[in-house]
Amino acid sequence: HALGYNTITKQTVRTSSMLFQNEWKNEHWGILLGGRFDKHNLINHLIFSPRANLRFNATQNIHLRLTYAGGFRAPQTFDEDLHTSMAGGERIKTYLAKNLKEERSNSLSLSADMYYNFGNVQTNILIETFYTHLNNVFAQRVLNDHDENGIRILERFNANQATVWGMNIEGKAVYSKWISMQSGLTIQRSQYKEAVEWDEDAPAEKKFLRTPNIY
């Protein structure tokens, strides 16, 4: 209930899941296969999300990993949708489009995890590249319409497809059991396959809005 705006969002979310996986491994190799079944009360069918992982220990201090995973986001109202924001001096609130479908993802990543000791200092560097393909990706657009409270409507709808790809680097140094330092850097690109018009007064964009390329 948004006090002061006379708006109420009522939503009941239930998810039942079953996870299974099996792993085969030896000193140098590891293979993991598995998946998850989800039944979300806002989706009328069962969703299967597979996963697979291939690990290779090149040496005792260098570990390589190739991972695939599927996933989804349900067509539901999220926490950030409960806030009434401002756009062009006008109140605006997020609503879900009719027949909104779940967003599906397929992700692939390749990483190298490396360890080295400099005297008493233990160090670890992780370098990872990733690629994610999204189907029925969620996007938002401002409609030239208002709800019963006079608040302009920001609609979440299914755009066609999108991709997110990039690289992640993380480093850690442990000086003692009391002192350690850790830092990371992610460089990525997020782009719709087809340009999305989020406002009739703004040009259509392929890039994700409010999504940093470096962080």
PLM feature spans:
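Short loop/turn motifs that connect adjacent beta-strands in outer-membrane beta-barrel proteins
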Residues: 27-28, 61, 117-123, 178
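Membrane-embedded beta-barrel scaffold of Gram-negative outer-membrane proteins
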Residues: 57, 65, 99-157, 163
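Gram-negative outer-membrane beta-barrel transporters
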Residues: 25-30, 130-133, 151, 155-215
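Surface-exposed extracellular loop regions of Gram-negative outer-membrane beta-barrel proteins
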Residues: 9-41, 45-51, 171-173, 178-189
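Transmembrane beta-barrel strands of outer-membrane/channel proteins
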Residues: 1, 33-37, 66-70, 79, ...
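Hydrophobic, lipid-facing positions within transmembrane beta-strands of outer-membrane proteins
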Residues: 14-20, 35, 48-54, 64, ...
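Outer-membrane beta-barrel translocator domains and adjoining extracellular loop/strand segments
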Residues: 1-7, 43-50, 77-83, 90-91, ...
